[in-house]
């Protein structure tokens, strides 16, 4: 079933179909992850995990930004997250997460995978939501977060080329340690622009 989201191209799942709904009047996209699902290519060589599924669209070839306000409305469990995701294949992907840490803190977490995952904790989030943004700059990508959707804090810049398929960019919920995770995305915006300065808050 196609899920049209205002302002975005047609969306499809990267893996198996997931649970999603869109409230057009509120501009809210809701994804619900099953228990035990995640994306992870263990840097220590352990088993990979690709049971989560992202709802996304073919990334524009030119520079762009995709942003959304994110929150998790279900009871929080370790490593659950609302995610902006970038995916080519299971060895080439990245995700920008509003994640719940083992210490019981909500925080921004970034993961970049080129065969193996490079995982990095970022800002602690004290509120119930956070704005996330992915920006394309040629073959490079930038991750930002914001408490208000106006001033953006730089999180990560990385170079990553696709694997066997072109990039898809979109939304995901994950619940690697819990029974489920419901993630809500609103204030969704796709802008065809290039960020001129990654560190000036714009």
Which residues make up each language-model segment?
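Extracellular glycan-recognition regions
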Residues: 1-202
């Amino acid at each position: 079933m196609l899920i049209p989201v205002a302002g975005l191209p047609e969306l499809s799942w990267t893996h198996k179909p997931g649970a999603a709904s869109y409230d057009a009047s509120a501009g809210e996209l809701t994804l619900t992850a099953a228990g035990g699902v995640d994306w992870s290519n263990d840097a220590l060589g352990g088993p990979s995990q690709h049971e989560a599924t992202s709802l996304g669209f073919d990334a524009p070839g030119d520079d762009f930004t995709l942003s959304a306000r994110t929150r998790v409305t279900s009871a929080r469990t370790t490593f659950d997250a609302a995610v902006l995701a970038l995916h080519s294949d299971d060895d080439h992907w990245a995700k920008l997460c509003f994640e719940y840490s083992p210490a019981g803190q909500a925080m921004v977490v970034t993961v970049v995978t080129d065969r193996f995952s490079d995982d990095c904790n970022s800002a602690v989030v004290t509120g119930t939501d956070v704005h996330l943004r992915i920006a394309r700059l040629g073959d490079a990508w930038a991750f930002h977060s914001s408490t208000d959707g106006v001033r953006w804090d730089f999180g990560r810049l990385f170079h990553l080329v696709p694997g066997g398929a072109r990039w898809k960019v979109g939304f995901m919920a994950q619940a690697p340690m819990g029974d489920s995770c419901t993630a809500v995305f609103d204030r969704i915006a796709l802008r065809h622009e290039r960020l001129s300065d990654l560190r000036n808050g714009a």
